């Protein structure tokens, strides 16, 4: 897992969010119209920025994300139960740039329609600091088609997690083994489980990554494998995995 540096692109992120907020102000009626998360996630420039921050990788499983498959993840969940709100806002404020003074808890329904917002801080549901790019949770579980929402963003829901990507030592905290499994401290078990990062599809993908590194397979070979099925199969042919015919043909193409 990689560290996501939200400070590096802070100015660009704030510029997009400020422009979004300004655009939603209606001077005629002196109020905001459609100032909400669903409108923000339509802005392509914002998605591109999040992908750039993450070098194109999913914040959780580290697969490359095609732009049309990007989902936006609220690190501090969009909606918190009233009885847990105070505790969880305090909890998430310890990570990254989720500190008070930069963002504040405010789901869509609580964003005031007037007067104009003075930012920063930003409502957490539309704050650059609180949003990262995730995949669709696409995995293979047999049959002809992949299943969505089986890991990462949508699988998590509103579960309380440790946002590991906001810890500078993230790559050391969660380590990839050559057999595709993950090793991590026991205190992160619930986070890994909430994200389903030990799903068999993800384990298989990590085996492939390990083989590429261990066998010094060149970038040129990897790029050729994207369009050449024979090369792709040759790269993964000695992995001891059963019943991955469809996975070999499809999933590895986008993630080698």
Model regions and ranges:
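Short, charged surface segments at domain edges that flank catalytic/cofactor-binding sites
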Residues: 3-57, 81-98, 111, 115, ...
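Beta-strand-connecting loop/turn residues
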Residues: 56, 68, 73, 179-181
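Hydrophobic alpha-helical segments that mediate membrane insertion or helix-helix packing
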Residues: 58-61, 245
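Histidine-centered nuclease catalytic patch
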Residues: 63-150, 155-156
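Domain-exit/linker segments immediately C-terminal to small folded modules
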Residues: 117-241
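Conserved small/polar residues in nucleotide/adenosyl-binding loops
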Residues: 245-252
């Amino acid at each position: 897992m990689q560290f996501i540096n939200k400070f590096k692109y802070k100015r660009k992120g704030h510029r997009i969010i400020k422009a979004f907020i300004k655009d939603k102000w209606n001077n005629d009626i002196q109020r905001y119209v459609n100032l909400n998360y669903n409108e923000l996630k339509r802005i392509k420039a914002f998605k591109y920025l999040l992908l750039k921050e993450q070098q194109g990788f999913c914040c959780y499983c580290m697969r490359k994300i095609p732009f049309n498959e990007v989902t936006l993840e609220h690190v501090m969940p969009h909606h918190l139960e009233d009885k847990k709100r105070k505790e969880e806002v305090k909890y998430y404020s310890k990570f990254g740039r989720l500190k008070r003074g930069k963002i504040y808890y405010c789901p869509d329904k609580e964003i005031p329609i007037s007067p104009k917002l003075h930012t920063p801080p930003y409502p957490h549901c539309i704050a650059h600091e609180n949003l990262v790019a995730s995949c669709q949770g696409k995995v293979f579980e047999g049959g002809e088609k992949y299943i969505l929402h089986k890991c990462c963003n949508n699988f998590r829901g509103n579960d309380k997690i440790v946002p590991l990507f906001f810890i500078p030592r993230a790559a050391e905290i969660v380590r990839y083994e050559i057999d595709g499994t993950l090793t991590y401290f026991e205190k992160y078990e619930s986070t890994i489980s909430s994200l389903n990062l030990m799903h068999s599809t993800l384990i298989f993908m990590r085996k492939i990554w390990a083989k590429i590194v261990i066998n010094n397979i060149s970038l040129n070979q990897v790029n050729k494998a994207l369009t050449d099925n024979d090369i792709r199969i040759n790269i993964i042919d000695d992995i001891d995995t059963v019943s991955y015919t469809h996975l070999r043909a499809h999933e590895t193409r986008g993630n080698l």
